[in-house]
Amino acid sequence: MWRPAAKTTGTNDVPLANKRRFGLPEEGPPSNSPSYAPRPAADIQYFNGRQERERDARDDRERPRDDYDRRRDDYVRDDRDRRYDDYPRDGHSDRRDERSKWDEGDRREAPRGRERSRDRGDSNEDGPRKRRSRWGDASAKVNVPGMPVAVMGNVSQTELDNYAIHVRLEEINRKLRTGDVVPPEGQRSPSPTPQYDAYGRRTNTRELRYRKKLEDERTRLIDRAVKSDPNFRPPVDFQHKRGSRPQDKVYIPVKEFPEINFFGLLVGPRGNSLKKMERESGAKISIRGKGSVKEGKGRAGNFPQDEEDELHCLITADDESKVKTCVALINKVIETAASTPEGENDHKRNQLRELASLNGTLRDDENQLCQNCGEKGHRRWECPQQRVYSANVICRICGGAGHMARDCRGRGDPSLTQNKQTAFDSEYTALMAELGEGGGSTPGSAPAAAIGAPGAIPPQSRVPPWRLPENWQTNSGGFRGPPNFQAQGYQQAAPGAAAYGQQAYPGYAGYQTGAVSGYGSPATGGADAYAAYYASMGQQAPAAAV
């Protein structure tokens, strides 16, 4: 085998001829292959210009990409980037670590970003993570002095309610005293739109909203405890805070239904509908918001926060139940107006009737018949049926519509005509009686009370009072002559009375007593003048009462 004369390159077995200049001579390290490249240190491994730590402990299996795998550069990882994984690690083979596919979590790289805590209420990030539980925190335990801790099985429902009310009241009082009124982050409701007062201060901050909610709940619980438990004594500051009466707001959907006049339906004619709802519920209703006051007019009180709010009804009362009753009445009016056509709304129809009655223009058309179809409930111009010309024909015999007198079924019945005439006479007699005048007497026209009354004159002998002889008798026992009768003088005097003779009255000397021309008692012929008077009138003289 040929060998070069000078050994300059060396082989895998023989190292290069390098001699140490200082120290003891020793063998150099074994020479590696030309393709060998030294592996960088574990703490300074680089990948695409970015440092990656603990690469050996990471699982290189494929997993779905998420937001944390998003790169900030345009480099893409490929097979060339894994060239360092092909070399043996610490003298072992180049195969990867054998681990189970069920190995989870701890060896994987934590995602970038802030770690989300399971319990949002735990603000201590450095401490151990709190386990979520359905039970409350031990620090929030409520201890009510004097209240039993163990609840027995023989407790009634009322006692359980009172116990729950006392525990909840103590919890609310503790929160209000310590100022811990804001619940944890996971139990908060979405924040509303910021609202400011006239001075630019925000009136609906988170703390103010939750404090007001707790105070309202405390007021309701105290009212409930006072009603259910006679031994309960409200707190001292309750009467002071009771000045803020319970109230509620009912917003009017004017934007959803701009064509409906909710304001008029709630107020009614001259405010009667609003007053009626206040009487039924016992609450006070005030309409506030945009559109409640005409432009250019100011309200008596200053309500800047209400003027900027939407149109609503502010309800205040002494009791929460009255507020709920009033809210139900207002919602009923709003729902009826929004779901019922205007022509079928009975509430609005009654308001129009009341307004016409107040103005004096009401015409009661409900009980009148339609002249076209004969039905109730509408007039002739509102009749849905076609025009019936026979409805305008009135029978003069029976008074019915739709036929003439010659076609009337009761044409030959005399009772119809007699009844019609009797009805006319009775109406005329009643009218004359109301006017204080005596009407013509007709058969059957006398009232039953007058006929059956004691001492009443029978109808057949009823005559005018000036035709009765006893009405002409004077205090002296004589009789006056009837009007326009050519009789003269007093001929008969009453017994025991001084007769008018020639000595007292010389002008009456020629008058005789008991003659036809004189007036005496009926027994002596004094009533003959009445007989002659009635004979001249074509009537028979009635018998004088004795």
Swiss-Prot record:
It is found in: Nucleus. Necessary for the splicing of pre-mRNA. Has a role in the recognition of the branch site (5'-UACUAAC-3'), the pyrimidine tract and the 3'-splice site at the 3'-end of introns. The gene is BBP. A zinc finger (CCHC-type) spans 368-385, 393-410. Disulfide bonds: none annotated. Residues 50-128 have a biased composition (Basic and acidic residues). This is Branchpoint-bridging protein. GO terms for cellular component: commitment complex; cytosol; nucleus; U2-type prespliceosome. GO terms for biological process: mRNA cis splicing, via spliceosome; regulation of mRNA splicing, via spliceosome. Residues 251-330 form the KH domain. Transmembrane segments: none annotated. Its main location: nucleus. It comes from Cryptococcus neoformans var. neoformans serotype D (strain JEC21 / ATCC MYA-565) (Filobasidiella neoformans). Pfam families: KH-I_KHDC4-BBP, SF1-HH, zf-CCHC, zf-CCHC_3. Belongs to the BBP/SF1 family. The keyword Methyltransferase does not apply. Keywords: Metal-binding, mRNA processing, mRNA splicing, Nucleus, Repeat, RNA-binding, Spliceosome, Zinc, Zinc-finger. Residues 1-141, 178-199 are annotated as: Disordered. One of its GO terms (molecular function) is zinc ion binding.
